[in-house]
Amino acid sequence: MNLEKGNIERKKHGVHVNEYLQSVSNPNVYAAGDAAATDGLPLTPVASADSHVVASNLLKGNSKKIEYPVIPSAVFTVPKMASVGMSEEEAKNSGRNIKVKQKNISDWFTYKRTNEDFAAFKVLIDEDHDQIVGAHLISNEADELINHFATAIRFGISTKELKQMIFAYPTAASDIAHML
């Protein structure tokens, strides 16, 4: 594309946009997903969220700003891997009082009943605020289970509250309380 001809300024990772996903150099151009230079991760759900912001701003004028709350990600290998929030290194460097809960859970019933060869988790908890700040999972259910951790981080659900939840059993979600 000849972006210069359209007076569209670009950065290393895409079109230089403002908080409305509008080009900073050509107000008639909007960009979303991987085409936009934003803080969003190059993931399909981020591109989808961006597209909703762009559509709203095209139809209603620049009234909706892009926000990137907690964004979970998954790798669809066998077993699946998923993460959300801070890495262990980021959490420890954040100055918070971090507790790391980590375990191979291949022998838990949830995973034995489906003949999984390997399942494990690492959950990072800010002990002073009883908040999850990161979660990293490996299992066949990791892609679904990570969304529960993303919800907890996004809405500040405490580990105490999560432990009180009653989930359907036997499901991967029913194991959350034992991961905290």
From Swiss-Prot:
The family database entries (InterPro entries) matched by this protein are listed as:
FAD/NAD-bd_sf, FAD/NAD-linked_Rdtase_dimer_sf, Pyr_nucl-diS_OxRdtase_dimer
Keyword Repressor recorded:
no
Kindly indicate whether the keyword Repeat belongs to this entry.
no
Q: Origin organism of this chain?
A: Staphylococcus aureus
Q: Which UniProt keywords apply?
A: Plasmid
- Put simply, this protein is called Uncharacterized 19.7 kDa protein in mercuric resistance operon
Q: What domain of life does the native source organism fall in?
A: Bacteria
